[in-house]
Amino acid sequence: MAILFAVVARGTTILAKHAWCGGNFLEVTEQILAKIPSENNKLTYSHGNYLFHYICQDRIVYLCITDDDFERSRAFNFLNEIKKRFQTTYGSRAQTALPYAMNSEFSSVLAAQLKHHSENKGLDKVMETQAQVDELKGIMVRNIDLVAQRGERLELLIDKTENLVDSSVTFKTTSRNLARAMCMKNLKLTIIIIIVSIVFIYIIVSPLCGGFTWPSCVKK
């Protein structure tokens, strides 16, 4: 389960975006953005196995796409965080910005927050207040039909292969680092055991050799 795609837009004008994996996100997002009214609103659209969550405030839309089994509370926590960071960074500039004007800067913020909110499953239990729970109850979920320009039914197509490859590389790197760390830990433990053994033998043998300088055992 993960947040698959996130976008910040003014109406249908995309200002910044980030995708967790490959897919026809932009084609689908354009259809969704065209259906979102300009007044302040929060809503979840349901389409197939995916959910489209959005917050619209001051004509700026903060939208993300998730699997249908991804917790809505986590999705809206993500959107609220993105909204706060975007408003703090750009303010009123977003009202007149050109398409993708903030993408070079803000896409990295989307990527970092997308990863953070996707991986931290305990986030809701820590951050979510009763007010947020009540707010979530008021956010409706609506089914939506998407139609491509050619009139055919539009489906969200996702290619997670690239992400799986990245995950495999990350897993191998993590495994190597873990093996290296375990090797160093075992080496340190071996050295400590050897030192302790030498000290122990020295303490045992010293009385038998007449003291700590071993006068009776060391020939002059």
Swiss-Prot record:
Gene Ontology cellular component annotations, sorted alphabetically: azurophil granule membrane; clathrin-coated endocytic vesicle membrane; cytoplasm; endoplasmic reticulum membrane; extracellular exosome; intracellular membrane-bounded organelle; lamellipodium; late endosome membrane
Keywords: Acetylation, Coiled coil, Cytoplasmic vesicle, Endoplasmic reticulum, Endosome, Exocytosis, Golgi apparatus, Lysosome, Membrane, Phosphoprotein, Protein transport, Signal-anchor, Synapse, Synaptosome, Transmembrane, Transmembrane helix, Transport
Stored SMART domains: Longin
CDD domains in the cross-refs: Longin (cd14824), R-SNARE_VAMP7 (cd15871)
Cited InterPro entries: Longin-like_dom_sf, Longin_dom, Synaptobrevin-like, Synaptobrevin-like_transport, V_SNARE_CC
Modified positions (N-acetylalanine) in chain numbering: 2
Pfam families: Longin, Synaptobrevin
GO BP annotations, alphabetical order: calcium-ion regulated exocytosis; endoplasmic reticulum to Golgi vesicle-mediated transport; endosome to lysosome transport; eosinophil degranulation; exocytosis; natural killer cell degranulation; neutrophil degranulation; phagocytosis, engulfment
Ranges where the v-SNARE coiled-coil homology domain occurs: 125-185
Domain Longin as annotated: residue spans: 7-110
Stretches in topological domain Cytoplasmic: 2-188
Membrane-topology descriptor: Single-pass type IV membrane protein
Subunit structure: Component of the SNARE complex composed of STX4, SNAP23 and VAMP7 that binds SYT7 during lysosomal exocytosis. Component of the SNARE complex composed of STX7, STX8, VAMP7 and VTI1B that is required for heterotypic fusion of late endosomes with lysosomes. May interact with STX17. Interacts with PICALM. Interacts with RAB21.
Miscellaneous remark of the record: The gene coding for this protein is located in the pseudoautosomal region 2 (PAR2) of X and Y chromosomes. Loss-of-function mutant (antisense inhibition) displays impaired granzyme B release and target cell killing by natural killer cells.
Task of the protein: Involved in the targeting and/or fusion of transport vesicles to their target membrane during transport of proteins from the early endosome to the lysosome. Required for heterotypic fusion of late endosomes with lysosomes and homotypic lysosomal fusion. Required for calcium regulated lysosomal exocytosis. Involved in the export of chylomicrons from the endoplasmic reticulum to the cis Golgi. Required for exocytosis of mediators during eosinophil and neutrophil degranulation, and target cell killing by natural killer cells.
Record-stated family: Belongs to the synaptobrevin family.
The protein, known as: Vesicle-associated membrane protein 7
Organism listed in the record: Homo sapiens (Human)
Gene for this chain: VAMP7
